[in-house]
């Protein structure tokens, strides 16, 4: 084995990507375009076996992105710093007592 585990950044892009028309003045004119994530991960697993992947599931995570992660058995990410930066501390999924077993917990990321 060459690696123990790989963190896939911007995992949500495997479900859909934000497409912005070339003539648009701002990104607000974009639309979500489906991506072939499910087919891709099935084919890679078929060829390589189980994948040692952590899905970076931060940002705009839709039920479809969550389903893609769960259906392929990839753990997601929790960031402790996000838990204590929320105005609604009682419901944030980043608080330690709300973490799910299939999660990898980081104190922070390169972005914060």
Which residues are covered by each model-predicted region?
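Catalytic cores of glycan-processing enzymes that make or break glycosidic bonds
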Residues: 1-112
